Amino acid sequence: MKIISNNSTNIDGVKLIQFERFMDHRGFFTETFRGSDFINKDLNLFPNGIMQSNESFSHKNVLRGLHFQWNPNMGKLVRTIVGHMVDLVLDLRQDSPTQGKIMAFDMPAKPTSISSSWIWVPEGCAHGNFFFEDTY
């Protein structure tokens, strides 16, 4: 896995992480997770290990409402495999300097894209998605 960039956002702790896809005439290959790559980029996002892994498919014009976890709190690493979604993040943390702030991240992904992005949604933040086309 090759992380190309790691950028902070206007919400404390929310990161936009871009990673490389390996392309050739057959399509693309992506190593979806390698813990050491996150640590090498000072992205220690999983101090307790990865707790859960999910995938979804959503049809065009679907809205998946704001989701968050309590007891235990859980951060989320969100990406589009193929399709187009906007991910919304809302900071619900009472002790956060960005409490109440909401951001939208446009996350299109085509099979021919040489890179793709994740949004890191830290514990205490809610997120939801709107899908502009059928999306994996």
What function would you assign to each model-found segment?
Residues M1-S113, E133-T135:
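Non-catalytic, conserved peripheral segments adjacent to functional cores
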Residues G124-Y136:
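Ligand-binding loop in jelly-roll beta-barrel domains
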